[in-house]
Amino acid sequence: NVMQDMRRPGCIQLLANQEWNIYEDNFHEAAGNPSYMDINCIDFNPLHPDTLFACGRTGLYKFADGRFIKHYSYDNSPLVSVFGSDKNYVVVQGLTFDSQGKLWLINSMNKEKNLLTYQDGTWTALSQNELSTLPNISHLLIDSRNILWFSNDNWQNPAFFRYDMANNKLYSTTNFINEDETKFTTYWLKDIKEDRLHNIWLATDAGPILIEKKETTKESPVLTQVKIPRNDGTNFADYLLGGVSISAIAIDDDNMEEIYHFTSGNSPLLSDNIESIAINDATGEVFFGTDKGLCSYMSNASKTNDEMTSDNVWAYPNPVKPDYTGLITITGLSFQADVKIVTSNGVLVNQGKSNGGSYTWDGRNRKGEKVASGIYMVETATNEGNQGTVCKIAIIR
């Protein structure tokens, strides 16, 4: 099969300011349009944030302000169908915008024009022979070096690719050999992500695979299966999540080694079948897309800022009302920032280091007692000792 035919009706929903907006989805009912099915990737144009493109088994779709604008298929674009003139199988499994507003996408099974860009009504084909017969090219990522990464997520031809956008050169990896020169087998590559240190992570059925920053530009990069020491008096170690089939990866900025294992049995997670993960960088909220719906977990790590100013450092909830019993979060901090919380007359009640770009406080002093009503000052400094900014928290008891 070219791809798994899930027969899921197309649906795009946008959560903003605690309200859901549902994108137009009844346009496929017009004569001649294919079924609007199995949409699996979306991205917003960074130059026109109200414009969204979506793709999947039935081609490419453009929306603006939630309204359907255009469907791209074999009859109005370079895209081709796997089955001749069947619009239900114009397979576009991944897309992404670059910082200049250019859309990058790959049309699986297109022998002539598989790697494509689209901008301002103009299509450009950057075809690559190695991609001409691959059935499930997906998971596009443009990293901090302007390298385009993607994978063929198919058990018959598992591979990942790096495309040098500046020089139109493609590098492929089809043999999987780790840092110990041990060959390992993987059948699926479900996700690709970059971390804050500019390493690349691959989600595979053999576990997470790391490509260190220094390896990312090499023609044959070393693949690292991260080892976790057993700490049992031996020199033995186990691979991080070795043998666990990883379906999605999201990376926050906290650089911590602590691992939580959530299941539908020990948490409110809706299902153990995780299809996607995304993090709200501003708040640290982690969203899990499952086969039974969407749920979220409030972590205490958000995106770091290089500079802490009054414009990007703030606390929530604020004010803290009498019936609130959760944690108070200060966000917008730099990596491992020093945080001190003091009373209006300078008495220290709490201090610590940021976790990623956030710091959480339980509203208690150093004796474990709830602090009284009042205005509390949050003083910040960088990890190097440079003064940051100050924000205020109002507590009402």
Q: Which residues does each predicted region cover?
A:
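Glycine-centered coil/turn sites that cap beta-strands in beta-rich domains
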Residues: 307-340, 358-361
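Short, conserved beta-strand segments of beta-strand-rich sandwich/propeller modules, principally
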Residues: 283-285, 372-377
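Short, glycine-anchored, charge-dense loop/turn motifs used at functional sites
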Residues: 338-349, 376
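C-terminal tail/sorting-segment detector
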Residues: 377-397
